[in-house]
Amino acid sequence: MDGWCERHTGQAFDEGGRWAATGRIDVALLQRLLEEPFFAKAPPKSTGRDLLHLPWLEQALRSEHAERVGQAGLPSAWAPQDVQATLAELTACCAATDLRRHAPLTTRLLVCGGGAFNQHLMERLAQCLPGVTVSTTDRHGVPPDQVEALAFAWLARAYVAGLPGNLPAVTGARGPRVLGAWYPG
């Protein structure tokens, strides 16, 4: 979302999701984006701009355009804000689908990182997850933009204390392991 936003608005991100909120979700494009094999993988999983970058999006747009050229009545070009709205929906749909599939008893979702500041995305998550309370980590005393730093601080503390920093059921490791190294300078 950030790369698309920067290309079309000159802003580094869609502040509050206001730009995405002005667009319309393109369901056919959304389905095309969901064909990415990463989305079908079971957790734990993580990705970012290493996979979901502008060239990936542009390829999906080209593929969808080629398919639409032969179909009457379907637009073959997109308003940039419609693509942004579709990317926000992709994010919300994927999170909601994985949560329902792999953690169906979830009643509360705490969002952190940049998405926690995107009101449009937060609203889409809430709509995609009826019965689940969607809020930010801030409501629980942890600023959303500090969660990653706190996680690394926790890992450092575990290392210093000689405690395992992994969960084998999550990481796939053969057992608990002390993570990291100390290189005094």
Residue ranges and their predicted role:
Residues 1-14, 178:
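Phosphate-binding/catalytic loop of phosphoryl-transfer enzymes
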Residues 45-62, 85, 138, 161-164, ...:
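Glycine/Thr-rich phosphate-binding loops that ligate phosphate moieties of nucleotide
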Residues 1-2, 14, 20, 40, ...:
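Generic, ordered loop/turn and secondary-structure boundary motif
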Residues 3-9, 93-173:
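Catalytic phosphate/nucleotide-handling subdomain of diverse soluble enzymes
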